[in-house]
Amino acid sequence: MNNPRTVSDTKRAFYHNHARPINSIYRRVVEELLVEIHLLRVNQTFVYDPVFALGVVTTFERFMQGYHPPADQTSIFNAICLAQELDPQQVQQDAQELLGRVRGQSLESLLDWISTAASLGGDEQQNRLRAIASNPTFKYSRLFAVGLFTLLEQAEPELGKDEARLLQVLQQVGEVMHLPVEKMQKDLEQYRSNLEKMTQARKTLEDIVAAERKRRQQNAAPDRSPESASATEAPN
């Protein structure tokens, strides 16, 4: 029997695939995501699914927004997936296919689609949701909740701003999918709170960088004070 991978193994694998330094506030985001996915992957009841994939992609994209250089974002995402022995292209594809399957639906239509999926199945995406709903040992996770919220948010973009409405929708989905509504509610509250904190931290960092750039430009500019101008223009 093979020993389970450790968090250290996962982090080592990540930095093997992405050796470049990660900028300041984003480093914590990456390492927390690495640990979160790792702890799920080593759990024997965890089963990969498209909703989880969408949660991973959404979390990465929203928390890594504004990362410089932008080209490194793909490398970092790929390294996160490879460190978890996941195919990054497959994760992206599963997330986009799930979003594409429900794109353009109203919230009511989406809820009907989920309800049908949970009880009867249907197309490939619905069958995978039915497998989740009928699995008594399904390993719920925050990333799954984020993926589910992303689907709901696509159908009704303002849903997150109406707490009562969001709770009502989560209860409806939780009932048919056999999901822990209270956990979902708390996880999504934390997710949105952390996202807001990240937005504020990013704005602060941008202000600091802009101020430093301005200071350097001022230091590099020629001194045009009256004294220096007089000295420059004084006859020999």
UniProtKB/Swiss-Prot annotation:
Q: What is this protein called?
A: Protein Thf1
Report the domain of life of the source organism: Bacteria
Region annotation (Disordered) maps to: 206-236
Which Pfam families does the record associate with it? ThylakoidFormat
Q: Which GO terms describe its cellular component?
A: plasma membrane-derived thylakoid photosystem II
The UniProt entry's coiled-coil ranges are: 180-220
Is Coiled coil tagged as a keyword? yes
The gene that this protein is the product of is thf1
Family per similarity comment: Belongs to the THF1 family.
What are the boundaries of the signal sequence? none
| Polar residues bias: start-end ranges | 227-236
Q: What does this protein do?
A: May be involved in photosynthetic membrane biogenesis.
Keyword match Coiled coil: yes
Question: Quick one: a GO biological-process term for this protein?
Answer: photosystem II assembly
Q: Give the record's keywords alphabetically.
A: Coiled coil
Q: Which InterPro entries match?
A: Thf1
